Design a protein with these regions (language model features):
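C-terminal cell-surface addressing/anchoring modules of secreted/extracellular proteins
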Residues: 498-500
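Periplasmic c-type cytochrome electron-transfer domains
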Residues: 1-496
Length: 500
C-alpha cells in the first residue's frame, strides 16, 4: 500500500523491485493528497531519512512526551498577541511579554483543530503577527493560521536536519493539508449531546460570568467556547477553549490560551508530589481551630502525602510541560485560590472565593473536571456512529436509528443508509433520497421496512459528506445507481490504470 498516491504496488521480493502498481479510489481533495508527504515522508523532509514531522506528531496528533526545544543560539521574539489577561494592568512592565529563546520542556501538541484558532505552539510564538499589521478575527495578524503554520518551515532545518527549508509552494501544500486535520467527536460525551448531572453542573459553572476564578475572568472568559465563531468567514468555524489570544496568568511565561478538545487524551499520569502550587489531595483532615495561618497554609499544601493511584499510562499530563496529573488537581492550583487585593502587586485586585477551599469547593472542581473531559469538538458525538438493522433486531436497533435521525434533523450529521448495494441520503422530515436520480424520495419507515429482505446499515457521517458517500461516489454528477444501470464506473474519476 502506497499512501502518498493511494495505490497498491506489487513487489518482486527476490529482485526487490516493483513489478506493478495501480491507484485506488481516493475521494480526498487534491490539496490533502499533495500535502500529506511533507508530514510523513522522512526521506523528503529530513537529513538521514529517519525523521519526519509525524515522528512526534503521530498521525497529526501527539506522542505523549515533552521536549525542550529552546534554541540557545536564538534571540527573543516579540509577543504581538492580544491578551486575555494583561500584565500591565497589574503594574508589570510591558517588555516581560517577550518570548525568550529558551522555553523549557513542553509537551507535543496535536496538529488537529488548528483552523480558526490563530497562533500556534504553547506560547503562540509561531504566528503571522509582525507588530505592524493589526490582529483581527478571523485571519489577520496573530489570528492568521496560514502564516502561523508557515512559520514552522525553519524546523525542517533546525529540528530534523533538512539541508534547506521547503519551497514556498511545498510549504503551502503542507499548510493546506495540516489545516484540514480535525478533532474527532468526543468519545465520552453522550451520543445525544446531553450531559450528566455532574457534567452539567461543571458546564454551568464554566459559563457563569459571575464566577470569577482567575482574577478577572470566569472560565469561558479566557477559554472561549463558541461553536459558531467566524461562521461564514471560514470553512471550519468555532472556538473550543481558545479564541487565539495570549495571556498573563501568573505563569513562568506568557502562553496562548489553550484549546481544550483533547483533555481526555492526557489522562493517565496518576499522582504527583506535594508542592506549594497545589492543594494536597485531602487538605481538610487534621486542621484544628488553634492553628496559626502559617500552620494552616502548610497543612493545606503539605498536610498529607498524595496517594499512590496505581500504574501509570503516560509519563506526562496536563499543562504545557505535562507536570500536572489530573484536571482536578489543576483546579487546585494556587492561581485559582482566594487571594486578597494587593497580594501580588499593589495593583492586584485579588481573586474572589469562587473555588473555595471547602468540601463544596472540591465538588465544584470535580464537576468542572467531568465537564472538561466531555468538551465540545468541531464534530458532534453522533458523527461516526453506525448500526445495521436486520429482519430480527429491530427491537434493539430501532432506538439507535431513531436517535441518528433525530440528530440528523438537528444538522449534527449527514445520515446515510446502505441496502443491497444501493445508497440513500436522509433529507430531513422523514425522507431519504436514493442513488437513482429520477426516483422519488422514500419515506423513512418504508426504507426501514426493507430490512425484512436485506440488512440496512445506517451511518452518521460528517456534515457535507453524505452526498458523496450515499449518492455519487465520484461526484461526477451521475448518481451511483444510474451508473450501475448504465454499466459505467462510479469510481472512475479517482481510479488509475494498472501499470507494469
Amino acid at each position: 500500500l502506497t499512501r502518498f498516491d493511494d495505490g497498491i504496488s506489487v513487489i518482486d521480493t527476490k529482485a526487490k523491485t516493483e513489478v506493478a502498481h495501480i491507484n485506488m479510489h481516493n475521494p480526498e481533495p487534491q490539496h490533502v493528497k499533495e500535502g500529506r508527504k511533507y508530514h510523513y515522508d522522512a526521506n523528503l523532509t529530513s537529513s538521514h531519512g529517519d525523521s519526519s514531522c509525524a515522528l512526534c506528531h503521530v498521525f497529526g496528533d501527539m506522542d505523549q512526551l515533552a521536549w525542550d526545544l529552546g534554541n540557545p543560539d536564538g534571540s527573543p521574539m516579540g509577543n504581538f498577541s492580544p491578551l486575555a489577561i494583561n500584565h500591565e494592568d497589574f503594574g508589570f512592565p510591558a517588555e516581560i511579554s517577550t518570548f525568550m529563546n529558551m522555553k523549557g520542556p513542553m509537551t507535543t501538541q496535536s496538529m488537529k483543530g488548528m483552523a480558526n484558532h490563530g497562533a500556534q505552539h504553547w506560547r503562540g510564538d509561531r504566528t503571522g503577527a509582525d507588530g505592524v499589521t493589526e490582529s483581527m478575527q478571523p485571519d489577520s495578524g496573530v489570528f492568521d493560521e496560514q502564516a502561523a503554520f508557515k512559520a514552522f518551515n525553519p524546523a525542517f532545518v533546525g529540528l530534523i536536519g533538512r539541508e534547506t527549508e521547503l519551497s514556498a509552494e511545498a510549504m503551502q501544500d503542507y499548510t493546506n493539508f495540516a489545516l484540514e486535520l480535525t478533532y474527532p467527536p468526543n468519545p465520552i460525551r453522550n451520543l445525544d449531546n446531553s450531559l450528566t448531572d455532574a457534567q452539567q453542573a461543571g458546564h454551568d459553572f464554566f459559563f457563569n460570568e459571575e464566577m470569577i476564578v482567575d482574577t478577572v475572568h470566569h472560565c469561558n472568559g479566557c477559554h472561549v467556547v463558541d461553536r459558531t465563531a467566524n461562521e461564514g468567514k471560514t470553512n471550519k468555524p468555532g472556538f473550543f477553549g481558545s479564541d487565539g489570544r495570549n495571556t498573563f496568568a501568573f505563569q513562568t511565561q506568557f502562553f496562548k490560551v489553550p484549546q481544550l478538545r483533547n483533555l481526555y487524551q492526557k489522562v493517565g499520569m496518576f499522582g504527583m508530589a506535594n508542592n506549594n502550587n497545589f492543594l494536597a489531595d485531602d487538605p481538610f483532615s487534621g486542621i484544628t481551630p488553634d492553628m496559626t495561618m502559617e500552620e494552616m497554609q502548610n497543612h493545606l499544601f503539605f498536610g498529607n502525602e498524595n496517594q499512590n493511584m496505581g500504574d501509570q499510562i503516560r509519563g506526562f499530563g496536563m499543562l504545557h510541560d505535562g507536570s500536572v496529573d489530573t484536571i482536578f488537581r489543576f483546579h487546585n492550583i494556587v492561581g485559582f485560590l482566594p487571594r486578597p487585593a494587593g497580594a501580588v502587586t499593589p495593583l492586584d485586585p485579588g481573586n474572589p472565593d469562587n473555588l473555595p477551599i471547602t468540601p463544596e469547593g472540591m465538588e465544584i472542581r470535580r464537576n468542572l473536571e467531568q465537564y472538561m473531559l466531555v468538551f465540545d469538538t468541531n464534530l458532534f458525538p453522533i458523527v461516526g456512529q453506525q448500526i445495521t438493522l436486520t429482519a430480527s433486531n429491530g427491537e434493539t436497533v430501532g432506538s439507535r436509528v431513531d436517535l441518528m435521525i433525530q440528530r440528523a434533523d438537528l444538522g449534527e450529521c449527514d445520515l446515510i443508509a446502505s441496502h443491497n448495494g444501493r445508497g440513500y441520503l436522509y433529507q430531513g422530515k422523514g425522507k431519504f433520497d436514493s442513488d437513482i436520480k429520477k426516483e422519488k424520495g422514500i419515506a423513512e419507515a418504508d426504507l426501514r421496512s426493507l430490512a425484512q429482505s436485506a440488512s440496512i446499515t445506517y451511518t452518521c457521517t460528517p456534515p457535507g459528506n453524505g452526498p458523496r458517500l450515499a449518492l455519487d461516489r465520484d461526484m461526477d454528477g451521475v448518481y451511483n445507481g444510474d451508473e450501475i444501470a448504465a454499466g459505467t464506473n462510479r469510481w472512475k474519476r479517482h481510479c488509475g490504470r494498472l501499470r507494469a
